[in-house]
């Protein structure tokens, strides 16, 4: 059985990985009304004059073979000194549990510090979600400065995607993606899994932050032969290009240049109705 979102974040935070986990506390949702004063006091002491996120961590939210991601509510940008606002946000999350079924003892609430100066955020799948192809698929927003645009799908900047073959991370030139995927690879080793769904953010100093991690639940639908087919195709492409770049006897020049229609058809240049320039 996979651990809850809250328990996983606590465990990863304790590992002191490249991925930073924003400061958090968690508590059971089922007895909040009985101990609300104690919890509010703890939140106020832990997060003084800061913006916090009140996040769901339901018992059935992140399973190994089934996910209820997005079915429960989280409330962002709650001011930690505002008792009424905190209570209202917690009750909103608990209500989202009750709308689906009765609250369970395993249901938790996460209270977590909001990140500041975010320059990029998004979701990484460590294999293609639909096919299992061996690529890191990074859906990201590097424009808005928010942390939830990709997961909510509500931003015009939420559709940027980068594919990086799992064996080609060392070929990257972008410092931010190098740092991000280095952190992802360490997390894979720590969790002993190459099939992860990761929510992340980067700050202005390119420090990677882990907001959530769960198992990819679409694995049973994958064709296990896809990895071999892709690798064979890539090898074929590499061989084809290598052959084309060989120096040709009797042809001037040392380098080959591949182009699309480098010699234009004059008819296409002047168009169907040519006229004097």
Which positions does each model-derived feature cover?
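Active-site beta-strand->loop segment that positions catalytic residues and contacts the acyl thioester
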Residues: 115-116, 187
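Conserved divalent-metal-coordinating catalytic cores
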Residues: 1-18, 84-90, 105, 122-277
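N-terminal beta-alpha lobe that positions the nucleotide/phosphoryl donor
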Residues: 1-110, 117-119, 196
């Amino acid at each position: 059985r996979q651990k809850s979102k809250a328990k996983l974040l606590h465990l990863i935070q304790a590992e002191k990985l490249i991925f930073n986990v924003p400061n958090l506390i968690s508590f059971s949702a089922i007895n909040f009304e009985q101990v609300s004063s104690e919890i509010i006091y703890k939140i106020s002491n832990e997060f003084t004059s800061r913006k916090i996120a009140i996040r769901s961590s339901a018992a059935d939210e992140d399973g190994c073979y089934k996910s209820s991601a997005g079915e429960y509510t989280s409330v962002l940008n709650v001011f930690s000194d505002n008792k009424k606002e905190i209570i209202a946000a917690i009750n909103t999350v608990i209500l989202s549990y009750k709308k689906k079924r009765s609250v369970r003892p395993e249901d938790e609430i996460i209270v977590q510090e909001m990140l500041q100066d975010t320059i990029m955020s998004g979701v990484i799948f460590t294999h293609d979600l639909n096919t299992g192809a061996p690529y890191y698929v990074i859906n990201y927003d590097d424009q808005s400065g928010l942390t939830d645009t990709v997961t909510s799908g509500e931003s015009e900047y939420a559709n940027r995607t980068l594919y990086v073959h799992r064996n080609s991370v060392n070929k990257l030139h972008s410092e931010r993606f190098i740092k991000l995927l280095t952190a992802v690879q360490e997390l894979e080793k720590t969790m002993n899994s190459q099939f992860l769904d990761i929510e992340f953010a980067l700050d202005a100093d390119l420090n990677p932050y882990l907001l959530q991690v769960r198992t990819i639940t679409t694995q049973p639908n994958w064709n296990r032969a896809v990895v071999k087919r892709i690798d064979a195709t890539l090898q074929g492409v590499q061989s084809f290009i290598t052959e084309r770049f060989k120096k040709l006897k009797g042809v001037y020049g040392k380098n080959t240049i591949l182009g699309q229609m480098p010699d234009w058809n004059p008819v296409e240049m002047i168009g169907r109705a040519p006229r004097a320039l």
